[in-house]
């Protein structure tokens, strides 16, 4: 069986994530530049089995022109059009992230629901019952089946009413940094497995909770100096400078949040010890 080649149009910040996972799987991947003309995308796609696109970066009319040339596109244009018809609501101070991947043979995987606040993400979202979590995830699975999704997406919904959709992210979920450090299988690997129609991986947490927080650089310092104190204080902290995140896995959520908040405050210069 020939090794497949995939074309990808996505945000710059996630291209390297997809490339790393493709390399691990031994899959060829061509990173197509954002803003390319329809003609150039068609030309670059000639040696690809299919292309994966972020629908937020290229118009549906352009995608249809590309598809008419014989290029296979994931997610399917029909799925993109179905999602585009959904009503969006204003963002809120607390939101839920529900992430799903689906293969052409309808195998589906979801991660635990993530709580999104202004500065911290928690997976799984605390203070929601198992019954509510199941209801939310089932509604997402049903939507993925209804639109015949191939690939993956993130639904960001109001934490007070999950029926209020706030945003849809295709290749760059808000919660993907959490899954990268704390899930058996991260989003980018799972997305590739989905579009390749490979069996999907385990999406469970490695620990009871994953907590990640946003980092802000101290205007009087740099992004390197804080490592000396923070890594010595807690060697379990994970840093991601590409996304400006700090993360932690564990079973004691209260202690984890204390550590994340301390890291945020020290990193930005709010505290000095």
Task: Describe the role of every protein-language-model region.
Residues 51, 135-154, 169-217:
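Active-site "cap" helix and flanking loop/linker of ATP-utilizing ligase/carboxylase catalytic domains
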Residues 62-83, 89, 122, 130:
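Glycine/small-residue-rich loop that forms an oxyanion/phosphate-binding "nest" at active or ligand-binding sites
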Residues 86-152, 159-161:
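Internal nucleotide-binding/catalytic subdomain
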Residues 1-77:
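ATP-binding N-terminal substructure of ATP-dependent carboxylate-amine bond-forming enzymes
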Residues 112-117, 167-174:
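Short beta->alpha transition motifs characteristic of CBS
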Residues 1, 43-44, 89-93, 102-106, ...:
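Solvent-exposed alpha-helices and their adjacent loops that cap or buttress functional pockets
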Residues 193-273:
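Peripheral (often C-terminal) accessory segments that flank ATP-dependent C-N-forming ligase machineries
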Residues 98, 161-172:
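A short beta-strand motif that forms the metal-chelation/ATP-contact edge
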